[in-house]
Curated annotation (Swiss-Prot):
Subcellular location: Cytoplasm
Top enzyme class: isomerase
Keywords, ordered alphabetically: Chaperone, Cytoplasm, Isomerase, Rotamase
Superkingdom classification of source: Eukaryota
Every PPIase cyclophilin-type domain range: 3-153
Gene Ontology terms describing biological process: protein folding
Gene3D superfamilies hit by this protein: Cyclophilin-like
Alphabetized GO MF terms: peptidyl-prolyl cis-trans isomerase activity
Classification lineage: Eukaryota, Viridiplantae, Streptophyta, Embryophyta, Tracheophyta
Cystine pairings recorded for this chain: none
Protein name: Peptidyl-prolyl cis-trans isomerase CYP18-1
InterPro entries documented for this protein: Cyclophilin-like_dom_sf, Cyclophilin-type_PPIase, Cyclophilin-type_PPIase_CS, Cyclophilin-type_PPIase_dom, Cyclophilin_A-like
Length: 160
């Protein structure tokens, strides 16, 4: 399964790991399908580290899962933050996943075992490059808005 994140800076296509982390994948895909993420901003951007979004309030303090509460981590030894473009659930501690997610800009091995990886970027790395270069202000908030306009879900990861 794959999705395309249609941002105001361009499109990013991600493979979603439905078999490896079924609960996280179900949550993300259902939120995408419902339009939950449409029009949300990426509220935190740290060059060389990651970009974070998925909070409908745009503050980094909001968002919930499809179950209306936090859900447990799905940490897998086979999934590592070992490359640019890893897609993970953001959390405020163990088993506190909701709707927020982040995409890594580089390897981040110190995150392994702490955040559920549920996908990876497969196309649109040039858009990640643009995002990473966006200037930020207090709280690592982008000075120029980076918006997730909408999400397209693809049943076949190789589909256009």
């Amino acid at each position: 399964m794959s999705v395309t994140l249609h941002t105001n800076l361009g499109d990013i296509k991600c493979e979603i790991f439905c078999d490896e982390v079924p609960k996280s994948a179900e949550n993300f895909l259902a939120l995408c399908a419902s339009g939950y993420y449409d029009g949300t901003i990426f509220h935190r951007n740290i060059k060389g580290f990651m970009i974070q979004g998925g909070d409908p309030k745009g503050t980094g303090k909001g968002g919930t899962s499809i179950w209306g509460k936090k859900f447990n981590d799905e940490i897998r030894d086979s999934l590592k933050h070992n490359a640019r473009g890893m897609l993970s659930m953001a959390n405020s501690g163990p088993n506190t996943n909701g709707s927020q997610f982040f995409i890594t800009y580089a390897k981040q091995p110190h995150l392994n075992g702490l955040y559920t990886i549920f996908g990876k970027v497969i196309h649109g790395f040039e858009v990640l490059d643009i995002m990473e270069k966006t200037q930020t202000g207090p709280g690592d908030r982008p000075l120029a808005e980076i918006r997730l306009n909408r999400v397209t879900i693809h049943a076949n990861p190789l589909a256009g």
